[in-house]
């Protein structure tokens, strides 16, 4: 990641990257801390004057000085691997100046268009977040939505379709605050996001509030490297559909992708492999359907025989026919129910995969 705004280099096997992709810029994003002084409330860090200094090639320090050289507020940024930026807000010698209660980190952003269509990007964009002791959750991707953060939160992510901007706390942000998301789809923006995060703390002689920012692609391996379930930003569905996509479809996809094949060919091969996996179920379904077709004339005859007669007798004779021929009328339904999670997992997996983005195949310019 380059140390300029939010530029992200995304390598591709098939397509050259002509220019860095920009998730947001100075006009579309605003982040600041609400800080309360013991003698005054409502100070915003973006109203303070910070003096920058570069300690190392990958480290930036911003310092807001006071009239006392031993008292200052400092922000430290350090570029790390996997699109991460380590950050800390430090209060030095401010224990008699700063009130650590009701301190919040505010982040507001309008998502720049990164895809060809604002409508399509907005449908796959929202605010995702993970309560410390629960699974990830998210706001509506289709309409304006908001939620209160009622428990500790591990991370909050502004998802821009195939990319995300996130803030992470190893210990978990304290309960309190809220998140907001709304599609706007106007001009160069697709969505608007807001997060108000509780970072209240006790202020002593040297207090540090650490967190990590992530600005990068929604790549499963990259997100999973955080070891905090951030990979769940990639929406593969829910329940058994998600489980099937994660533990069946994705391993097959990763195996084939390791051979550097064209992405369109990989889609074809994954589809064929899945069809082979469910072939026994498909065969059983076809076999049951064939038997029912053979019996159709006899079933029709029974229906005509009891057209105005006893329904119980009709049912009894129909079941006797099934037993005599060894046909189970429900045998064709069970294979279909078993196949559904696999087929729907395939259907959900490909549109959610960043590997599809900007990959062409035959007449398709973009497989995503």
Regions picked out by a protein language model, each given a short descriptive name:
Residues 1-232:
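Soluble non-transmembrane domains of integral membrane proteins
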Residues 88-90, 101, 111-121, 155, ...:
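Helix-loop-helix
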């Amino acid at each position: 990641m380059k140390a300029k705004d939010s530029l992200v280099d995304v390598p591709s096997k098939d397509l050259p990257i002509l220019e860095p992709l920009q998730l947001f810029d100075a006009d579309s994003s605003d982040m600041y801390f609400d800080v309360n002084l013991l003698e005054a409330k409502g100070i915003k860090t973006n109203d303070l004057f910070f003096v920058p200094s570069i300690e190392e090639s990958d480290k930036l320090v911003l310092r807001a000085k006071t009239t006392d050289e031993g008292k200052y507020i400092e922000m430290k940024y350090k570029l790390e691997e996997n699109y991460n930026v380590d950050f800390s807000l430090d209060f030095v010698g401010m224990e008699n100046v700063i009130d650590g209660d009701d301190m919040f980190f505010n982040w507001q952003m309008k998502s720049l268009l990164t895809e060809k269509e604002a409508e399509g990007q907005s449908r796959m964009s929202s605010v995702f977040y993970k309560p410390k002791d629960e699974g990830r959750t998210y706001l509506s991707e289709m309409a304006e939505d908001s939620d209160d953060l009622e428990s500790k939160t591990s991370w909050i992510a502004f998802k821009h379709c195939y990319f995300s901007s996130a803030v992470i706390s190893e210990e978990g942000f304290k309960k309190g605050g809220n998140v907001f998301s709304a599609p706007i789809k106007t001009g160069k923006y697709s969505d608007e996001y807001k997060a108000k995060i509780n970072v209240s703390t006790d202020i002593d002689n040297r207090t540090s509030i650490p967190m990590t920012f992530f600005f990068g692609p929604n790549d499963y391996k990259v997100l999973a490297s955080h070891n905090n379930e951030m990979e769940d930003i990639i929406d593969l569905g829910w329940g058994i559909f998600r489980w099937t996509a994660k533990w069946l479809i994705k391993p097959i996809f990763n195996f084939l992708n390791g051979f550097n094949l064209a992405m369109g060919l990989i889609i074809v091969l994954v589809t064929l492999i899945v069809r082979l996996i469910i072939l026994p179920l498909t065969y059983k379904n076809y076999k049951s359907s064939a038997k029912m077709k053979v019996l159709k004339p006899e079933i029709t005859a029974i229906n005509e025989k009891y057209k105005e007669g006893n329904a119980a007798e009709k049912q009894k004779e129909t079941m006797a026919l099934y037993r005599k021929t060894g046909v189970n009328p429900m045998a064709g339904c069970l294979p279909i129910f078993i196949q559904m999670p696999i087929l729907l997992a395939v259907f959900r997996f490909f549109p959610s995969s960043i590997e599809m983005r900007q990959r062409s195949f035959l007449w398709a310019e973009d497989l995503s």
